[in-house]
Structures are given as C-alpha cells and as structure tokens.
C-alpha cells in the first residue's frame, strides 16, 4: 500500500500538483489502513504558484473494502497565490468519503461539513461567507454497466449567509450534470476548460432552489462555452419576493411583476447576457 501511495503522489506530481506533509504515519494493518498527515500541503506548478495548507489530514480504508476511503480534515485550510493568502476556510467538522473504481480512479465523492466559514479576497476586498451545514456529492454518471465521462452533482447548504447578501440566511439546493466533466479530474485550469469546451461540454442544471425569508428562486437551464470562451446557453428563473433584489441591481422596473410568480429567461448568446428581450451586459471571455 505504501508503494501505491507513493505512485499516486508521483502521478499527481506529473500533473503539476505536489503533495507533501511534515509528518506522515501509516498504521492499522492488517484490519484497516490508516494514514495521517500532519501539516499537509499541495502546491501547483502554475504561474501563480498556488498552494493550499491544512493542519491535519487523516484517511482510513477497511481491509475488506479498500476502494472506499473515509477522510477527515482538521482546519484551517489556507490558500495562497503568489505567496499572498487569498482564502481561509474553517469548520467544526469536515468529513469526506471517496470511492475508487476498478481502474483505481475516483468515481464517487461526498463531502459534508458543519459550521463552515470562508474568508476570501475578491478584487482587493475581503469577503466572508458561512453555512451551518453543507454537502457536496459528485459521481461519474453510470451508463449500464460502465461509467460515462459525465459528472453528476448535488449540493446543499443550510443557513448560508454572506456579507454580499445581508438579511436572512438562505437554504440552497442544486442538482445537475457536467457533461464530459471527467476532464476536470485529470487536467487543470485553462487546459481543463479548453479541453472540456472542445469536447462540447455543458453544465445541465436540473434545479437550483434558493429560499431566503420571503424570497424563493428556482433556476433550471443549460450552459456551455462558445468559440470566444464566453458563456452561452439559457437558464430560466422563476421566483417571488424579489423586489429588493431587483432594486439593488438597478432593475426596479421588474419589481412590479411580483404580483405573481416571476418567470424570466436569462439568455447568454453572442457575448451578451439578455434578460428576456433586453440586453443587460456584455460577457467577458473566461480565459
């Protein structure tokens, strides 16, 4: 198992991600396999020299089912770019499970956290977000007896609050599929996005549901990247109680539509965002 772990670390290094820890221990054999990494770090070889640091990372796999790995992390998680801290993630508890398929590749991931808080830098400003409970579930979509390149996702957040959206905490739930999302497992950054775009990758949003006080929003749709690397596609938004949101975004003319449930298509086409028939903004290229 030790040699397999070293091979995985070497494989990651070949992809430009370098894993290390100050003190690594292995125990539990022959009943289970336990790995503990104190002061874990992963550094990217990209131009920004991005680096993530974690106080402790532990993983356990039972000997009768080594394909299922249970992971526990002790924070904080600190992220750096160009030697500057850009994000700080803390939590009361954070647990994860990772399932490996017969080819020893990951095919299913679940992440569950309680009392999670995030501080991050955006355009020179510090922002804060928090959630009392969050879940992330990913899996390669099964097709018959095999696995496709599509990644299905489900995300939940309870008690979500942020400085950018003052007021009651929100409940968020979303499900969907990233077609050809497997490329993001083996590639990174612009290379992953461009490979995904050329493969005609698409994000299929089955449902995004946001509830916050008297406000309720449901979003469905499909998005991709066009030849100019700009977002293209359409999402349909329906909701109620959104008067304050429209006014804060300079769209007070739409607040009168709140007598009944609002239903509006957001169309991303030819480099522009359209709200129904109205051109709202010019879209930038993502890379």
Q: Where would I find each of the regions flagged by the language model?
A:
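Short, hydrophobic/aromatic-rich segments at coil-to-beta transitions
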Residues: 69, 107-110, 148-154, 200-207
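Extended terminal
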Residues: 22, 191-198, 208-210, 224-229, ...
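Flexible, membrane-facing loop/turn or short amphipathic-helix motifs
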Residues: 41-49, 77-89, 116-129, 159-169, ...
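Residue-level detector of the transmembrane beta-barrel scaffold of outer-membrane proteins
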Residues: 154, 218, 232-236
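Alpha-helical transmembrane signal-anchor/signal-peptide segments
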Residues: 1-13
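N-terminal beta-strand/beta-hairpin edge segment
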Residues: 14-146
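Extended lipid/amphipathic-ligand handling interfaces
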Residues: 23-27, 54-64, 90-104, 127-146, ...
